[in-house]
Design a protein with these regions (language model features):
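SAM-dependent methyltransferase catalytic region
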Residues: 1-194
Length: 194
């Protein structure tokens, strides 16, 4: 920062963060996600399935997204799939944010980093993505401490299976911020909520 002010950086319109890091003398470290091959294989498998009709139907969820590496990688893979289906990059970026990518993390800061990473990836393909009001589906998991039985009953809507699923996740996420990564959340079917 001593050698270059932020105004000078902006004036040069350096758009590549690696270039900025290099010019500022910073260490730029963003390791590749170890799961990239697995993500690619799973998406290829989905695409080959006979029931695959529309790339918008593919859902990629990272339940422990951290800073969003897997989501960013999946974004690029999905972009190629959209392009193969005839979408423009701009339309594909919007569709990916709206229909395909979902991420959760217990850490609010990690969720913010993932939001930033996914939006920067979307901006790579659509320079006006911020003005479109599209928000990625990346969220910090909230504790269930404040959820009372009336709220649960409202969402369960007299469905005993849904009530049991809600009870399970409410119990599992009690004091979630305290327990963090040692939480174990039992699988549950929440399809009735939609």
């Amino acid at each position: 920062l001593d050698e270059m002010s932020w105004d000078e950086v902006e004036a040069k319109r350096i758009s590549n963060e690696e270039e900025i890091a290099e010019q500022m003398g910073w260490k730029y470290y963003l390791p590749e996600a170890a799961q990239t091959k697995e993500v690619r294989q799973q998406l290829d498998e989905i695409q080959k399935q006979s029931e695959y009709k529309d790339v918008r139907d593919i859902k990629v969820i990272d339940p422990c997204m951290g800073s969003g590496h897997i989501l960013v990688y999946a974004f690029d893979v999905l972009m190629k799939m959209y392009e193969n289906d005839g979408y423009s990059q701009r339309d594909a970026a919007q569709c990916i944010l709206e229909h395909n990518l979902f991420g959760l993390d217990i850490d609010e800061r990690a969720a913010q980093l993932a939001y930033f990473a996914v939006m920067m990836k979307a901006r790579q393909y659509d320079r006006r993505i911020f003005s479109r009001g599209i928000q990625p589906h990346v969220y910090a998991i909230a504790e269930s401490n404040g959820i009372d039985s009336f709220t649960r009953d409202y969402f369960a809507n007299n469905d005993p299976k849904l009530r049991a699923a809600l009870d399970s996740i409410i119990n599992d996420l009690h004091d979630a911020k305290e327990y963090g990564s040692i939480l174990t959340v039992a699988p549950a079917d929440f399809a009735a909520l939609y």
